[in-house]
Amino acid sequence: MVNRKYPTGPFRLVPESFLVSKHNAFTSYSRTCSFLHKGTVAIFGPSSIHSSSYIQTLLDRKEIPHVETHWDRKLLRHNCLLNLHPHPSILTQAFLDVVHTWNWKNVVLIYDSEESLARMSPFVSSFRRWVTLRRIDLDHFGTYRSSLTSIKMTGATNFIIECSIEVLEEVLKQAQQVGMMTERHNYMITNLDLQTIDLAAFQFSGTNITGVSRYLLKVNRYSGL
């Protein structure tokens, strides 16, 4: 966009990227240093919260802009950091508004990791009604069906799903496979990347699936799902 807007400008912006495993902070730090040697003017990421704090410290010291897009529990606003992720308090209030509007008397919070539970802890502590916490784990077949089946047996119908985007679509498909996608069931998905998932498989189930937009922070209803 900048290059197109200023085609005759004295410089052009050239993006460079690299992939690194989620917990490999050392490689993230080393690759960032190599970028800085090339004259990099800004760093976006990493997406992993495990590595981001190390990169943030380096870029603050070098006074290089650092842009984050992930949830950050500490939200340390340093001189060169810009975090584009909605503040946890704003998301918590949005989730509370949704469940209160629907007048849910109880809800099952389905999560897939300790990090997921930490993201939802403000909601759990603020919700004045009954919240059941259920973690889903892979069974010996490599699926979530065992965990989901046990949740189904409780008879619950109102669910909040807090899962990583990497597994979210599979969790929804397997919930449908075990009979948790009917007109009686309601889902609120907290992952802000829900729009990247194809929900066509659930359009005739009668299930209400609701997500929250990252950009406008308004509730989007997927009618007829």
Regions found by a protein language model. Name each.
Residues 24-25, 88-92, 137-141, 168:
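A conditional alpha-helix N-cap/helix-loop micro-motif detector
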Residues 37-136, 178-211:
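Extracytoplasmic ligand/sensor domains, especially the bilobed periplasmic-binding protein
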Residues 27-30, 50-54, 93-94, 144-145, ...:
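Short alpha-helical segments and helix-capping/turn motifs at coil-helix boundaries
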Residues 4, 49, 119-139, 145-158, ...:
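N-terminal extracellular/periplasmic ectodomains of secretory-pathway proteins
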Residues 14, 18-42, 97-98, 143-155:
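Short, well-structured alpha-helical segments in soluble
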Residues 1-15:
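Signal peptide-proximal N-terminal region
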Residues 164-167, 215-225:
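Extracellular/periplasmic ligand-binding modules, especially the Venus flytrap/periplasmic-binding
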Residues 68, 77, 81, 140-152, ...:
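Immunoglobulin-superfamily Ig-like beta-sandwich domains in protein ectodomains
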